[in-house]
Amino acid sequence: MKKQFIAAFLGLTVACTQALAYLGPNDKDYKPTVKPKANCSPATARLTMKFNDVSALIEQGGSMFQNRAASVAAYEVPKGSNRFAIFAGALWMGGTDVNGQLKLAALRYRSGNDFWPGPLTVTPGTGNFNPINPVGDDAVRDFGEANIDPDQCIAYDKFYTIRKAEVIKFNLWWECNAGVTTEGCDEITAPSNDELNRIYGWPAHGDVSRGQDYFLAPFYDRDQDGNYNPDSGDHPWYDDILGRDDIECGIDRRISLYGDETHWWVFNDKGNIHTETNGDPIGMEIRAQAFSFATNDEVNRMTFYNYELINRGTQTLYNTYFSQYLDADVGNYADDYTGCDVSRGLGYMYNGDLIDESDGGKLGYGENPPAIGCDFFEGPYQDADGIDNPGPFYDEATQTEVVPTVVDALANNGIVYKGIGIGYSDGIIDNERFGMRRFTYYTSTSAYPYNDPGPAAEYYNFMEGQWANGSEMYYGGLGTGTGGSQTLSDYMFPGTSDPLHWSTQGEDMSGLYPNGWDETTSNNPSGDRRFVQSAGPFTLRPGAVNNITVGIVYGRSTEGGLMASVEAMKRADTKAQALFDACFKILSPPDAPRLTIQELENELILMIDNPISSNNYQEAYAEIDEINITDPTVDRFYRFEGYQIFQLKAQDVSIADIADPDKARLVAQCDIKNNISRIINFQFDEALGFSVPVEKVDGENSGIRHSFSVKEDAFAQGARALVNHKTYYYVAVAYAYNQFKEYDPTDPLLLDGQKIPYISSRLNYDGTAISPTSAIPH
């Protein structure tokens, strides 16, 4: 292996006391003030996420999930189905200055522009942020003029894509080159030129000569000199690799990278005049990352988005809200319902009937269509008030869950559900963060003020929890106060998700709505719904750093009523929430071994091994499951147990299909010789509505082997011998085992046992997606 770096040739609201609406019910006139502009051209970069079973188009200029050129939806799930669940999405943000002037940036369909590429200018030394050290809740980034030059908008009109596997590969290669380690170095291959270009071209630093913040995209600073230098082992920063855990989850405010594949970009709201909303600019710099994971469960049909929002301007904004807007069209756009789960901080869209018809040439989902949701995991920091604001917590002394009353929570700026905030009743003062505090909606075909917003003030009214004209939203019916109650509600269509009546500030509505309030119980006409999830109000100070993290979750039931797919989506969301709670440190099963095949006459010799890049190197895999096994007193580790090799029917069969005997069949298996052989998982069956036992492996329990002779075609009819000069396809997976407690659905004492004792590979030994290995006997 060469000892020199390939890098050498790369050359590389008003004041807090006011709560008025910004438009009255009969006032639709709005004249934006003249504001300075940087004359940046609109962003043009776009990218399609497609690492897992979702294909999602995103744009540098803030527009999400929309193919604007064709005016069609571009969030496809499952990938390759030609069926789409979301038409558009974007961030909204707004607040008022000391004079009551509204500042706002938002998008719907990007018919205009409120966002442009690139970082904004700052005055060095105005903040206290240092990414080398852990960062607490008093973090302030540099702020200043908050401007940008047009050439810098052009320079940053791009995405920076990186994969965790590439960073791991670079680390191992660098450490061997630098003499940090010699173990396994003979097996280490150099990163490709493309991989090195991505690492050396990582935008770790802004141009200080142009007034930009020196620290830009997150990077791992191996020698802690504050400078990004891959020659010294620095690289894009994933905090969950190679045994590292530098960022204390939930405490340290530094941002690292997440996901198996990550797309990072930076944009702002000061590049030019706001032509989408006509709002006055804030001076906001947004550092975004879109990421996903390849798995063999529901996470494979999820995507995630983290936004680090920095107020680079010198003005303080009051009554500020940050919001996630989503125009989710489940197949056919015209027949949807919307709703939310208050306790989860989850907004969702589902079909208004049990058949999603096609719309012209755009395919619907057909019978039992899915539901799509957006979980608002975390939002901005709540204003400091010198106390640890109340929220649900587990009392170790009494071993019970303690939940404050709605009255107590409202009086002390607390919460009553874990899913709508972070940092409450955790013993730490002033680290509380908002979750989803408003859920509003509108319909494209409705009359004003129940339809799309126009000027900035109408966007802001939806963010505050009001209709476009500033009129209130009510519990029941369509939320208009007609056909429902006269009780105000912060959340539209909560269903039965709010047993503590948080949305109505403690007023019990179960007498009027014994089955909860959703679109089905109100018999609403379905339509083209859009929704807004908001966090706030809070005070946005110069240099303030906030984060929004959201996840798009998908669920589909094979039978049941209108809410069946919503319930399936919520089950998926439980995994999404657990993944967020673990700071996206996903449980990684043992990597698939390297599979090589020797071709003989009417015979194939399949050989497996685990290079040093594998998490199962020397078959020593052991991984803690912090997502599904939450009891710290039990054994939470999965440990390597064995291998399985499958013959695939065709080259296009994926790892997700290995349980389908029409597509994949087991041809070889081995496992450690111990007391573990037959392993059964209990998996939820949508049709039956409960978990059923599924045999995952019937182990031969004869010890580990690394070569296997295959002489028969598992798919052959009649004569089964392998045919010379015919192509066959195989995949090998490793599996691990944990049974901290036996599970038995018939025994009340064992209902909290391990339902999933078996997990198998989701990625290759080198971090890439698992793909078939072909062989031709001859």
Predicted regions and their residues:
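Extracellular/surface-associated beta-sandwich interaction domains
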Residues: 22-778
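N-terminal hydrophobic alpha-helix used for membrane targeting or insertion
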Residues: 6-7, 214
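Positively charged n-region of N-terminal signal peptides that target proteins for export
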Residues: 1-4
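Bacterial N-terminal signal peptides
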Residues: 7-17
